[in-house]
Amino acid sequence: MIMKKALAVVVFGGALFAAGAAFAARQKPALPDFAHWTATELKGYEGPLREKVAGEHRTSSVKLADYGSSNVAISHREANGIPEVHAHMDDYFVVESGEASLVVGGDVVNPKLVEPNETRGDSIKGGEKKRLVAGDVVHIPTGMPHQLLVEKGKRFTYFVIKVKAK
């Protein structure tokens, strides 16, 4: 009789443990601020972005996430960008497709503060030109002038990460 009660307690306890473990597995908190964009997902943005290209600079972008201290977007260009300088943000580009030249360094010609911490200009004097193609990754530190140049008839799609500098 004691063996039957002990066996019943073990079986009941095991069942309770298994049910509790299953419940806990379902109750795991989501990974806050975790994001994963697959290569296929990112490629899927190119067509819709090309359809939305507008303005003199023939660009379009979609912000994918904003985490406060950083944000992520995917952008598409079919013409030259505007020279710019970010006072408090580092830029990282991951080239998805196409090709462009990135002018970095030097001085912005006719700089204008267009919004707090953001300067734009007419061109960059004395910068270095770097050719970018699919798979390339660049880091543009805070305060560094930069401009993307896209040859007529070419396209350029890139994943952008902006991080507040310390």
Where are these regions (language model features)?
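A short, N-terminal "cap"/entry segment at the start of jelly-roll beta-barrel domains
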Residues: G20-V85
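His/acidic/aromatic-lined binding-pocket segments of jelly-roll/cupin-type domains
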Residues: E84, D91-V94, K129-K130, V137-V138
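A short hydrophobic beta-strand segment most commonly corresponding to one strand
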Residues: G153-K166
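Conserved metal-binding segment of the jelly-roll/cupin
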Residues: R131-K152
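Short, conserved beta-strand element in jelly-roll/cupin
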Residues: A87-G106, E115-S123
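An anionic, turn-rich surface loop/hairpin at beta-sheet edges
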Residues: P111-V133
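Bacterial N-terminal signal peptides
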Residues: V9-A19
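Bacterial N-terminal signal peptides that target proteins for export
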Residues: M1-V10
